[in-house]
Amino acid sequence: MSRIGVAFDQARAEGRAVLVGCMPAGFPTVEGSIAAMTAMVEAGVDVIEVEIPYSDPVMDGPVIQRASDVALAGGVRVADTLRIVEAVAATGAPVVTMTYWNPVEQYGVDAFARDLAAAGGTGLITPDLIPDEAQEWLAASDAYGLDRTFLVSPSSTDARLHMTVEQCRGFVYATTIMGVTGARAQASAAAPVLVSRVRAVTDLPVGVGLGIGTGEQASTASSFADGVIVGSALIRRLLDAPNLPAGLTALRELSAELAAGVRTPAP
């Protein structure tokens, strides 16, 4: 079982969901992103999702786009992301990478899988790659023992959902709000329905994302999902801060609030 699987099992034994915190690699700098992700772990985030910044992020909302633009302007590369993965994995928290597919193709699919595994990464979330076009990635992830997480949404047909989760390993990512990422005032009412649909066809844990930004929302999501995935709300704490130390303080505060939320599932 992967480290992600262990984290989900431990959380399930505690009667709660796993908290997954997301941050772009190299934002605000390479060292700054390592400090940010480490702070998140220290404040109670269970799993870190490191996003490889990309110039055409079709699914990312304005907050993640702004942070990714900062990272790209700073010259961050895939090699920097792997160094960040290695540093954050040293905290003991499982680290999964999220990337659009083009950077992996440019790097080389087999080489990327090899180097991600060597850095201590547990697997990859691929928002714009579907299983029926992922033969090379399926082979590479098998070869290097990496989890692979594909996305399902409320619009997924039953046939598409079944085919997608069949190729997942580690957990399934349920995008519970249609559209781009970003914290919402209210979590999607479609989320519990989508989680139930996924659970009907797989025993894999289900993580919900897109729209969660408060401890209350995390508590609600923890009552029906196995994982609560938060990105934009955490990133905004760094974007809105006057400097990195202030940003890290704000990041710790929100991470602790979210961690408390998943540990007290709503009835």
Curated annotation (Swiss-Prot):
<comment type="pathway">
    <text>Amino-acid biosynthesis; L-tryptophan biosynthesis; L-tryptophan from chorismate: step 5/5.</text>
</comment>
<comment type="function">
    <text>The alpha subunit is responsible for the aldol cleavage of indoleglycerol phosphate to indole and glyceraldehyde 3-phosphate.</text>
</comment>
<dbReference type="InterPro" id="IPR011060">
    <property type="entry name" value="RibuloseP-bd_barrel"/>
</dbReference>
<feature type="active site" description="Proton acceptor">
    <location>
        <position position="60"/>
    </location>
</feature>
<comment type="subunit">
    <text>Tetramer of two alpha and two beta chains.</text>
</comment>
<dbReference type="GO" id="GO:0004834">
    <property type="term" value="F:tryptophan synthase activity"/>
</dbReference>
<comment type="similarity">
    <text>Belongs to the TrpA family.</text>
</comment>
<keyword id="KW-0822">Tryptophan biosynthesis</keyword>
<keyword id="KW-0028">Amino-acid biosynthesis</keyword>
<dbReference type="GO" id="GO:0005829">
    <property type="term" value="C:cytosol"/>
</dbReference>
<protein>
    <recommendedName>
        <fullName>Tryptophan synthase alpha chain</fullName>
        <ecNumber>4.2.1.20</ecNumber>
    </recommendedName>
</protein>
<dbReference type="InterPro" id="IPR002028">
    <property type="entry name" value="Trp_synthase_suA"/>
</dbReference>
<keyword id="KW-0057">Aromatic amino acid biosynthesis</keyword>
<dbReference type="Pfam" id="PF00290">
    <property type="entry name" value="Trp_syntA"/>
</dbReference>
<keyword id="KW-0456">Lyase</keyword>
<dbReference type="InterPro" id="IPR013785">
    <property type="entry name" value="Aldolase_TIM"/>
</dbReference>
<feature type="active site" description="Proton acceptor">
    <location>
        <position position="49"/>
    </location>
</feature>
